[in-house]
Design a protein with these regions (language model features):
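DE-rich acidic low-complexity regions and acidic surface loops
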Residues: 1-176
Length: 176
């Protein structure tokens, strides 16, 4: 199941894909694809050329919008992490007795970190102690160069109220 994004609704697919911060690895895919939102031809050409060089045989790569103007080193590091994740899945599959869950998509808070946290992020506020631990572990394993202050908001006001984020929801659900 793929979550709805922007104008795209939820989709169900049998294609395996492993999303990274900048790249999506498709272990049984083919080719190098670039996000349509990257619209400068020079950047598309740069990413396509890099993708051809670094793509493992028999796989497909999709460069996400976030890969625009990102250094080759960070893109390669992202791909290496995805390849390692795929190898771990394959190893677990070899030793597991079906039925068994061998991989799970990241929870919502980790998707937010993956997609929105960058080198300019200095603070993340979370209202769940367990989610803070998962977030710290995620950053240690995936974004080791980021230094972020995690603030636990669980004992304070509701996080959406504190940052005045409820108004758009209230007007949407209470028309008139």
């Amino acid at each position: 199941m793929k979550e709805p994004t922007g104008s795209k609704g939820p989709r169900l697919t049998g294609n395996i894909s492993l999303p990274g911060k900048y790249i999506i690895l498709q272990p049984f895919g083919q080719g190098v694809n670039i996000s349509r939102k990257i619209n400068t031809e020079t950047e598309r050409s740069r990413l396509r050329a890099l993708g051809v060089l670094i793509k493992p045989p028999g796989t497909g790569l999709l460069f996400r919008t976030e890969s625009k103007e990102i250094s080759e080193e960070l893109l390669i590091e992202d791909l290496e992490n995805l390849i390692q994740k795929w190898e771990n899945i394959l190893q677990l599959n070899e030793i597991s007795n079906p039925p068994m869950l061998i991989s799970r998509d990241e929870d919502f808070s980790l998707k937010i970190l993956r997609d929105y946290v960058n080198s300019s992020t200095t603070k993340v506020t979370i209202d769940d102690t367990h989610a803070i631990e998962r977030a710290k572990n995620y950053l240690v394993n995936n974004e080791s160069n980021f230094i972020i202050d995690f603030h636990n908001n669980s004992k304070e006001d509701h996080i959406l109220e504190k940052y005045k984020l409820t108004k758009p929801f209230k007007s949407h659900y209470n028309p008139g």
